[in-house]
Every structure is written in structure tokens, then in C-alpha cells.
Amino acid sequence: MALTLLRGMRTPVSSGSNPGLFFAVLRPRLSRFTARAESAQATEPKAAPPPRSIQLATKEAAEQKTQGFEAVIGIETHVQLSTVTKAFCSCPYSYGAQPNSTVCPTCMGHPGTLPVLNEKVVECAVKLGLALNCEISMTSKFDRKQYFYPDLPKGYQISQFDIPIAKKGHVDLDLPVEFGGGHRKFGITRVHMEEDAGKLLHSESSSYSQVDLNRAGVPLLEIVSEPDMRTGIEAAEYGAELQRIVRYLGVSNGNMQEGSLRCDVNVSIRPVGQSEFGTKVEIKNMNSFSAINRAIDYEISRQILLHKEGQADQIVQETRLWDESSQKTFTMRKKEGLADYRYFPEPDLPEVVLTSDYINEISKSMPELPEAKRRRYENMGLSMQDVLFLANDDNIGHFYDSTLEHGADAKLAANWIMGDIAAYLKDEKVSIDEIKLTPLELSELIASIKNGTISGKIGKEILAELIAKGGTVKGVIEEKDLVQIADPAAIEAMVDKVIADNPKQLEQYRAGKTKLQGFFAGQVMKASKGKANPVLLNKILGEKLNAN
């Protein structure tokens, strides 16, 4: 089918219009799901979401009824780097900027322009390669990956083909406890540098699609895994671990909703015990890790059903789109093979030659990574549930470590962060680095409870104020007169008064209704405004209630 393209036409910038390049809508190539996924208007930048756990299906739902088959899953992950400028030109990139406002002749593919490699891209690639336990190539090169699409202005993408910058690595992770837990090790085939394409903007109300080339030339690192995963949960956790790693390294914000981290999943099935792979199907359009889990589980079920119905020949090598509304995958296009891309060396860029000193300097600057942090926390005696919560977010891990540096008990600090502080972060939808509480004051709060200066109940009230308003533990205690009453005589006097004021309850208690001790304790705490030492209170109260 012939398609007419209006090349190079650009609309004036005005209210109600979009300065994108116009192309006839490519109906045969694009599905209705793609069209719905993109807005025809520029999207405003969004703040990074607060830390949260991956919402996956239950363990029982994740266990596929494979009926003698096993899934083979590999993932290609594209990580958009947080560099100041693009990969091969000096244009900046800002998510949500006005379409076609951060472009130049180089990233728009004008004739006669030449690429110049951004050194920061190489540094990020080496960092990620080391973090993934890869072999770093001392010499690598760029290649042209050629295909036609309106968002690819040069008609080819600068990538790496046969000599990537890193290869033969692995990633370690721990599955959540609710899914059975356990350690997993997944192989990494390669990490290579490349540039991003532009972005097609579709509108169902128009017969044209627009092209925004702001993203064209933005540096990417593609991470290709070995086909080592067997379930949707494993694949989702693999993607989440890569996100944690790039955030720990600072090479990318890893935000899936901005396209900074994109996962394309390859799924096939085969009879258990068979060494040969089945027909591989690629799945795209998954914008969360829970969507990755659900898309894979659906695709496994679809392929098993076709095998059971004698229609295995209908499983073809293709690209399918995940549709969130129907919870199904749909055919997008036939999958290209390597020969279709006609790779050949990029003649306008020299080889990338590294030295041992350069790699060693980068290695020395590497931060502690998620896997090392998990093992350190585990050796401190924390449960795996605590370990995963604290280590899975770099900001939370840093806050926790800083609290320990100020002398806080490891388990008590973990309990406070995972309890009241985590609840506040969830309710207010903020990150831990946005609250006014400091690690020093959390350690002071824990110490004040431990040494009896304040009670745990008062501690919770102080914590809430410190989180919202800031300040110091000592200052709040003095300002509100919250020092715990630990004088036995003072507590005994309050106990005597409460017992005297409640003769009926005293009679019921001594008749066998011993649960009423909680009533008396509550009345004393009320009289003391929550400041009575609870251990001392219960001791004195028990003696008084049981006295003859």
C-alpha cells in the first residue's frame, strides 16, 4: 500500500497548534492502542513519583498452569541517559518541552552534518557495564542500523552491533517474600550505546500524525538479557532491579512514565526438558513493572492454549502490543530480523578506545549498589522484608544509613522508617528526601524513647511534628513539656486517685474481669497526658489492683 508523506512541513507555533512535523497516519503500521497511548499535545514535566513497591499478582496467580511447558523470557531494556546534551550534538533534552524546540541540523539528519560523540555517554556505559558485572570492551565501534520510519530522520540509527561496549555480565536480585523469596541470577548478553528516535504523536480525530524530534539523538544504553527468566514475576523484578541500579549510579532517572526506561519482552514456550527454543514473540507498550508481569503471564497462557489446540503454527515471530484496558496482547507487526536492518560500520565516527586507567578511575567512583546494600543489611540481622524495603530505594537507604551513623539501633531505626515514616510518605505521596525530619533527629528520638525520657506514644506525636514542620526532638519536648514521668511516687498518686474514682470497675476487676487493668492504665495515661512511664505504671497498677 502506498503511503503519502508530507515531508518537512512545519506549522507555526501558536496557541492551539502543535509545531510537530506532519505525516499521513500510518494506519497499516500502527494499532489503535498506539494511537491512544500518545497525546497530540506536549506533556508537562512531572515530578518523580514517591518510592513504592511493585504491585504484582499474587503468588498463586503467578504460578502458571504450564501443562508440561515452560516459558523462556528475555528482556531488551532501553535506558535514557541523564546527560546535559544529546549523544552526537550539543542540543539539550528536556522531557515535556515544546515539540521540535530542542533540535539542530545534526539530530534532524540534515545532509552534510557530522556526529560528535558525547564523552559522558561512554562514561555512563562503562559505569553500567561494571555495575552489571560485564566485560568492558577496550575497543568498540558504532554501526548504522537502517530502517524506515517517520521518527527516524536520518533513515538509520547510530547504534552498536557486533562489538558492544560491554558484554557477558549478570545481575543478582532477591524476589519479594510474598512471592516465595529466593535469590536469582540472570545473565546479561550485552550493553551497547545508541541514539533514540523521535516520537510520533497520534490523534484519532485527525488523518495526520505529527513527529516530535526532540528525543531524536538522545543517548540510550540498551541492555540485552540472556533468556534466563521463566515467569512474569521474575521478569518484573529484573526490570525493577535495573531501574534501581541506574538510579543508584545516577546515569538515568529510570522513570517509566517518561520513557526513560523501556522494556521490550521476548517470550516463547517449549516442552519441559526440550533444549531448543520455541518461536519468540516480542511484547511492547508496557509502562509499569506490574504490566510486564501481567503481559507475560497472558502471553504464556495464549501460547500454551494454541499448542493444546493444535494451532502452534499460529505462533509467529512478531511484535505484539500489550493493551492495559483489555489485559491482552495484540499483533502490531511482523518482527524484523537482523538482515532487515542492514547493519554496517558508522563511517563518521572513530572507534571508542578505552584505557585501563580510565576504567579503574570510574570503578573507584562507583557507589554501593543495591545487591551489596542488601547483603550488608542482611548481615546486620534484618529480615529480608526489611532489607528489600530499605535497599530498594536509594533515598530511603541513604536516610537509614545516615540514621545509623548517628548511633541509632539498626532494628529500631528500620521499624520507624518502615512504619510511621513510610505511612506518611505513602499518604502524602512524597519521597523521604522531601520531608523535614533529619536522620540525626530520628536517632535522637529513638534514643529518647530508649533512655526513658519520653514514651513510645509521645515519640509518635513528636515524629509527626518533626516530619511536617522540622525542628529538634529536644526542642519539641521542652516546648510542650513532654518529658516522661518516671517518679514512682507521682505515678502511685495518680494510680490511687484513678482507683478511688472508679470503685465499680475495681470491684469488677477483683471479681475476675482482669482485662479492666487496661481501663485503669488508660485513665492514668489520660491524667498524665501520656507522660507516665508505661512500664512503671503497669507495675504499680498491678500491685494496687491486686492488693488485699
UniProtKB/Swiss-Prot annotation:
Transmembrane segments: none
One BP annotation, GO: mitochondrial translation
Coiled coil: none
Recorded superkingdom: Eukaryota
SUPFAM superfamilies in UniProt: GatB/YqeY motif, Glutamine synthetase/guanido kinase
GO CC list: chloroplast; glutamyl-tRNA(Gln) amidotransferase complex; mitochondrion
Alphabetically ordered keywords of this record: ATP-binding, Chloroplast, Ligase, Mitochondrion, Nucleotide-binding, Plastid, Protein biosynthesis
Record Gene3D superfamilies: 1.10.10.410, GatB domain, N-terminal subdomain (1.10.150.380)
Enzymatic reactions: L-glutamyl-tRNA(Gln) + L-glutamine + ATP + H2O = L-glutaminyl-tRNA(Gln) + L-glutamate + ADP + phosphate + H(+)
EC number: 6.3.5.-
Principal location: mitochondrion
Claim: Zinc-finger is one of the keywords in the record: no
GO MF, one example: glutaminyl-tRNA synthase (glutamine-hydrolyzing) activity
Localization annotation: Mitochondrion; Plastid, Chloroplast
PROSITE patterns associated with the record: GATB (PS01234)
Additional notes on this entry: This protein may be expected to contain an N-terminal transit peptide but none has been predicted.
Self-association state and partner proteins as the record states: Subunit of the heterotrimeric GatCAB amidotransferase (AdT) complex, composed of A, B and C subunits.
UniProt function note: Allows the formation of correctly charged Gln-tRNA(Gln) through the transamidation of misacylated Glu-tRNA(Gln) in chloroplasts and mitochondria. The reaction takes place in the presence of glutamine and ATP through an activated gamma-phospho-Glu-tRNA(Gln).
HAMAP family named in the record: GatB (MF_00121)
Homology family: Belongs to the GatB/GatE family. GatB subfamily.
Protein name: Glutamyl-tRNA(Gln) amidotransferase subunit B, chloroplastic/mitochondrial
Gene from which this protein is expressed: GATB
